[in-house]
A protein has these predicted regions:
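Secondary-structure transition motifs
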Residues: 46, 65-188, 208, 236-256
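Mature-chain termini and adjacent capping regions
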Residues: 9-10, 16, 131-137, 200
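N-terminal type II signal-anchor transmembrane helix
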Residues: 1-45
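Contiguous, well-ordered beta-strand patches that form the walls/edges
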Residues: 207-212, 218
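Short extracytoplasmic
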Residues: 42-65
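Short, exposed beta-strand/loop patches in secreted or surface proteins that constitute
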Residues: 53-54, 185, 215-218
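Short, solvent-exposed coil/turn segments at beta-strand boundaries
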Residues: 58-59, 188, 217-223
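Transmembrane beta-strand segments that form the barrel wall of outer-membrane beta-barrel proteins
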Residues: 197-199, 223-230
Length: 257
């Protein structure tokens, strides 16, 4: 019996190592990148290309040179590198536990024709939306230990609205030099435990600069606590130890939208 167990373990280990070696062959990675890009292009009905996909130890995926056009044929998303490392065991209990996500060198271009029109990324939301006519409540259980963002740019335009050079305009935003280090300890349907260790952003048109924002937030459907809040602007700094908020339900925040 012991010999049989050793044989089985040896076969499983051999298959595991063989799969890892196979997925790290450059030609296999190229074929996999083309296959995944074609499948996503079919789902999204838009052009998408992927330079390389690298899967390491079957729980880490690295995607290089991702490019997605909107349905008008203009570049909507460009990412130099996206990598994620996740824990496999929590998946069997319906939980998503990601130990690390890295998003480096990205450029996102969002727009809509008029304030009432749908945005150019609506087709992505529609493609992955549930087709069930009966609405089911999803039990969200997500953990991201570390989310690192570097060298990010985001633009947003309502094309029918006038630009205002030198002034902040929510209809024409140019965010650049986005840097973030975020930890999401727990996110469920009615609770959150997260920390923004660092967030910095510049707005190109107005010259606004958020040098650093940091805080820790713990909340549920009736109360929220924000700790270690600190914000640094070029000529202003503000820090608060603890902020408490009480409310009847999460629906109370709908009035702020």
């Amino acid at each position: 019996l012991k010999k049989t167990v050793r044989w089985v373990l040896g076969i499983v280990l051999g298959l595991y190592i063989g799969t890892i070696l196979l997925l790290n062959i450059p030609s296999v990675q190229r074929q996999m990148s083309v296959f995944v890009a074609n499948e996503l292009a079919s789902i999204l009905d838009s052009k998408i290309s992927i330079g390389r996909i690298n899967i390491g130890l079957l729980n880490r995926i690295i995607i290089d040179d991702l490019l997605l056009d909107d349905q008008s044929g203009k570049e909507m998303l460009k990412v130099t590198r996206l990598s994620a490392k996740f824990d496999i065991l929590p998946l069997f209990s319906g939980k998503i536990s990601i130990s690390n996500i890295q998003l480096f060198g990205f450029n996102i271009n969002l727009n809509k024709q008029t304030p009432k029109d749908k945005p150019n990324f609506q087709f992505v939301l529609d493609a992955f939306a549930s087709k069930d006519t009966v609405q089911k409540k999803n039990n969200l259980d997500l953990r991201i230990n570390s989310l690192l963002i570097r060298r990010g740019k985001v633009s947003y335009d309502v094309l029918s609205e006038k630009e205002t050079p030198g002034k902040f305009n929510p209809q024409h935003l140019r965010l650049r030099n986005i840097i973030a280090n975020i930890s999401l300890k727990a996110l469920q349907n009615d609770s959150i435990n997260a920390a923004i260790k660092r967030l910095s952003i510049e707005e190109e048109h107005s010259g606004f600069e958020l040098k650093k924002l940091s805080l820790k937030v713990i909340g549920n459907d009736q109360r929220m606590k924000i700790e270690n809040f600190a914000i640094d602007l070029p000529n202003t700094s503000l820090a608060m130890d603890t902020i408490h908020m009480d409310y009847d339900s999460l629906g109370a925040f709908d009035n702020l939208a």
